[in-house]
């Protein structure tokens, strides 16, 4: 697979995260930022939510962004009609494809689903819209029926089929098998939409790409329904570094858009969140710090330069004397070996007591002053310095 197209759904599925509600300015700012980042497709909203949603979508469509814009619709006349007024060029027409949801959610059967796919995809195409046929709950559906749905949709003019792991129950090996199967049977674009209920959204997305997916759904920071979606930043960096697939995204712009979505959503990014967390390039353990100082690739899997970031070395419970000496040297203080060891003990006690990652410079200087006042315990005991 030489390339993969990102269809980011931060403005649709990301906003469906309980309690998240972007205002118009925030949605426009996020859309601009995603386009400037180089994201080729944006799913920007749900037209059937009402006039206010449609107005914002229309405003985004009027920005002249380089990204293709999509609207998410249920497979029904009302939603398709609403989408036509938003200015988007493509729609995702979504319907359940599992027998479970067809019966218990819609009280319908497979024959009805196939008829509606043919009818509404055809109407969307007549209206001048490109179509992605969204297969809700595809992960729990009969794959032969998913193929049938895809064939009917393609015959009616759809260019793409979206395989949605709606309740997040897929695992990478199963996802790989399903996309290999679909790519053999269907001659159309294939898109994966993964949820993170078992922490596998990004892994499932990568597996789908290995199986033949041409498009992937992502959200910034993994924001989304329940446990969230495949994170844009994770997918972009993993595809590039682990599989040699360049998505065309400006990775140095990722921290800024992560912060933008964090503010707009009110959802704080975890300190250890992969790629964008504040602590993902922070090192404390003495063995790791020593290795980094000798050669950064000793303990570097992801190069922070790709994100415009850098490694950070901090003092704490797991630090070594070498890091203590270097830190005090930066403060203009050269330590003897006994001082390094003594101060390391104080730093470890401080970190355990305060639960902080690193003492501040003033605190380090205070530790040193106290140590100097006490003197060398070995000399005080008559030992050798």
Curated annotation (Swiss-Prot):
One of its GO terms (molecular function) is homocitrate synthase activity. Disruption phenotype: Fixes nitrogen very poorly; has very slow diazotrophic growth on nitrogen-free agar plates. A double nifS-nifV deletion no longer fixes nitrogen. Belongs to the alpha-IPM synthase/homocitrate synthase family. The gene is nifV. Keywords: Nitrogen fixation, Transferase. Coiled coil: none annotated. It catalyses: acetyl-CoA + 2-oxoglutarate + H2O = (2R)-homocitrate + CoA + H(+). It comes from the Bacteria. One of its GO terms (biological process) is carboxylic acid metabolic process. Its EC number is 2.3.3.14. The keyword Transferase applies. InterPro entries: AIPM/Hcit_synth_CS, Aldolase_TIM, LeuA/HCS_post-cat, NifV/FrbC, PYR_CT. The lineage of its organism: Bacteria, Pseudomonadati, Pseudomonadota, Gammaproteobacteria, Pseudomonadales. Residues 4-255 form the Pyruvate carboxyltransferase domain. This is Homocitrate synthase. Pfam families: HCS_D2, HMGL-like. SUPFAM superfamilies: Aldolase (SSF51569). This protein is a Fe-Mo-cofactor biosynthetic component.
């Amino acid at each position: 697979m030489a390339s993969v197209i990102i269809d980011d759904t931060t403005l649709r599925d990301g906003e469906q995260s309980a309690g998240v509600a972007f205002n118009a300015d925030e949605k426009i700012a996020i859309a601009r930022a995603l386009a400037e980042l180089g994201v080729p497709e944006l799913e920007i909203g749900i037209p059937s939510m009402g006039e206010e949603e449609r107005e914002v979508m229309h405003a985004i469509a009027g920005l002249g962004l380089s990204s293709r814009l999509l609207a998410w619709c249920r497979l029904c006349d009302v939603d398709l009609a609403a989408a036509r007024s938003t200015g988007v060029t493509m729609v995702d027409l979504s319907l359940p494809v599992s027998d479970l949801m067809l019966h218990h959610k819609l009280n319908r059967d497979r024959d009805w689903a196939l008829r509606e796919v043919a009818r509404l995809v055809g109407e969307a195409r007549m209206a001048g819209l490109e179509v992605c046929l969204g297969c809700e709950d595809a992960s729990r559906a009969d794959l032969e029926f998913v193929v049938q749905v895809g064939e009917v949709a393609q015959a009616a003019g759809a260019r793409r089929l979206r395989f949605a792991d709606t309740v997040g129950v897929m695992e990478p090996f199963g996802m790989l098998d399903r996309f290999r199967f679909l790519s053999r049977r269907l001659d159309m674009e294939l898109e994966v939409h993964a949820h993170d209920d078992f922490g596998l959204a990004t892994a499932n997305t990568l597996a789908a790409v290995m199986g033949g997916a041409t498009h992937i759904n992502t959200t910034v920071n993994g924001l989304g329904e329940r446990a969230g979606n495949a994170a844009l930043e994770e997918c972009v960096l993993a595809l590039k570094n682990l599989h040699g697939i360049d998505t065309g995204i400006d990775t140095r712009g990722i921290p800024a858009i992560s912060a933008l979505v964090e503010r707009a959503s009110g959802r704080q990014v975890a300190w250890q969140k992969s790629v964008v967390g504040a602590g993902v390039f922070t090192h404390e353990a003495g063995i790791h710090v020593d290795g980094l100082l000798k050669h950064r690739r000793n303990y570097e899997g992801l190069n922070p330069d790709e994100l415009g970031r850098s490694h950070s070395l901090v003092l704490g419970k797991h630090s070594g004397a070498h890091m203590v000496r270097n830190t005090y040297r930066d403060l203009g203080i050269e330590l003897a070996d006994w001082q390094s060891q003594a101060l390391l003990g104080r730093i470890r006690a401080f970190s355990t007591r305060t639960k902080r990652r690193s003492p501040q410079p003033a605190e380090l200087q205070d530790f040193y002053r106290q140590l100097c006042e006490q003197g060398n315990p070995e000399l005080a005991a008559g030992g050798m310095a």
